[in-house]
């Protein structure tokens, strides 16, 4: 009996061993544990090698500053401290100021710049802070070194608070704070033509004087044909300097255009002086422009821009060949083309600067920046023409308007209600987020 039972058990075991494996057994894999694959000896070997590499490194201390950082600060300082070393008068309403580095306040050398750029001057008048841009009339070469200098020219403007304050108060020895050079009115060979027709009006001649100096000393390589508009001969700025530069370089030619009906206009071939009567029109540009491609650079008062742009539009030039220096600050919204009108003559603006909230009132005919400044609120700004981006702010509520000729915002800024207060007018009460003063 027991023998049969033993045979039966052996038969069952044999039957089980001969059965095919199930799907589960076929698909199963042995799990991999990476921790178990590590060997302690390998870790200690790596640690030893790593320590050896550390010990073989330089014993010199990590420098607190690298040369590239020092160079960046020299080229693009947050501020520059200067003092007035010379004042030159051009009649009762215009002066040229020579600015030298003020070593006593930490500026030993001035930042380098390109002809066509400007600096912003920071001024406090009766406790209110203002910033105004002025084109550099000196050459980049004149700014180099310990004896380097900048030159700016300030002309009185009608109802101009800052310009009149400067002309009445600035004198030799006065200490000033200015920005690093900024702006994009410089000559770029890859974009601009080999010949530039410069159109200047009044004190808008200053960047062209810097260009002419750079051409004469070989730092710029293009031909400058300058059409310089003034009322009469007495209002021409830097005439002697341009006469000298024309003789120094054949690439510089100056034509004076006088608008005064009584002005005597003729070509003096002996001295090289050329005068035209009237205004800078398309036909006048064609008269002096070369047959080859040329660029037009403009710098002058807003009235000149408004007139010249219409004339230039008839010339059929590519857009890249027409360059404008900053349009300049605007002072009256209702005087601008396309102004839609406002809800009231006075607006209330609630301003958030970081965690501070202030509410002020102002004249709706002023730009938003002007309203804030008159209420003692300092907003970072440089160009005051909607170009530099320093005053970039967010409109949280309310309606605003920007003149088309001064609207340089990106599409994203328009979509998400960002503005430049320096060239924007309030059409209703507003809530704004503005950047803090630097």
Give the location of each predicted region.
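Short, low-complexity N-terminal leaders and the immediately following helix N-cap/first helix
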Residues: 2-94
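FNR/FR-type flavoprotein reductase catalytic core
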Residues: 2-36, 164-350, 357, 364
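Ferredoxin-reductase
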Residues: 66-175, 194, 230-232, 243, ...
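Ligand-binding loop in jelly-roll beta-barrel domains
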Residues: 143-149, 190-194, 219, 425-435
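Local cysteine-cluster metal-coordination motifs and their immediate loop/turn environment
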Residues: 207, 377-401, 405, 412-428
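Redox cofactor-anchoring modules in respiratory/redox and cofactor-processing assemblies
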Residues: 313, 323-375, 379-380, 390-395, ...
């Amino acid at each position: 009996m027991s023998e049969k039972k033993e045979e039966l058990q052996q038969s069952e075991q044999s039957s089980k061993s001969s059965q095919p494996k199930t799907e589960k057994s076929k698909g199963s894999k042995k799990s991999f544990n990476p921790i178990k694959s590590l060997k302690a000896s390998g870790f200690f070997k790596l640690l030893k090698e790593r320590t050896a590499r550390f010990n073989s490194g330089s014993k010199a201390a990590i420098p607190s500053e690298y040369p590239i950082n020092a160079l960046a600060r020299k080229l693009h300082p947050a501020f520059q401290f200067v003092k007035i070393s010379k004042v030159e008068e051009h009649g009762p309403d215009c002066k040229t100021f020579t600015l030298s580095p003020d070593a006593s306040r930490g500026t030993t050398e001035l930042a380098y710049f390109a002809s066509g750029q400007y600096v912003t001057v920071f001024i406090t008048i009766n406790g209110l802070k203002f910033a105004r841009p002025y084109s550099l009339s000196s050459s980049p070469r004149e700014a180099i070194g310990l004896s380097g200098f900048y030159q700016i020219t300030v002309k009185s403007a009608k109802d101009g608070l800052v310009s009149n304050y400067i002309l009445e108060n600035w004198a030799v020895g006065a200490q000033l704070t200015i920005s690093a050079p900024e702006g994009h009115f410089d000559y770029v060979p890859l974009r601009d033509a080999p010949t530039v027709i410069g159109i200047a009006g009044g004190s808008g001649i200053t960047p062209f004087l810097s260009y002419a100096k750079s051409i004469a000393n070989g730092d710029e390589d293009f031909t400058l044909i300058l059409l310089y508009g003034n009322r009469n001969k007495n209002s021409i700025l830097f005439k002697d300097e341009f006469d000298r530069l024309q003789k120094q370089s054949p690439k510089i030619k100056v034509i004076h255009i006088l608008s005064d009906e009584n002005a005597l206009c003729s070509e003096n071939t002996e001295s090289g002086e050329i005068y035209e009567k009237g205004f800078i029109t398309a036909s006048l540009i064609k008269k002096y422009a070369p047959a080859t491609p040329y660029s037009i650079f403009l710098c002058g008062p807003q009235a000149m821009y408004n007139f010249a742009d219409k004339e230039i539009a008839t010339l059929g030039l590519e857009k890249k060949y027409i360059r404008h220096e900053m349009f300049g600050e605007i002072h009256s919204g209702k005087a601008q083309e396309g102004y839609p009108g406002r809800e009231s003559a006075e607006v209330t603006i609630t301003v958030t600067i970081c965690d501070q909230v202030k509410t002020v009132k102002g004249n709706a005919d002023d730009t938003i920046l002007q309203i804030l400044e008159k209420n003692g609120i300092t907003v970072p700004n440089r160009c005051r023409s909607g170009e530099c981006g320093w005053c970039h702010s967010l409109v949280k509520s309310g309606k605003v308007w920007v003149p088309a000729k001064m609207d340089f915002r990106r599409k994203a800024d328009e979509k998400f209600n960002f503005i430049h207060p320096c060239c924007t007018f309030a059409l209703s009460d507003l809530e704004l987020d503005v950047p803090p003063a630097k």
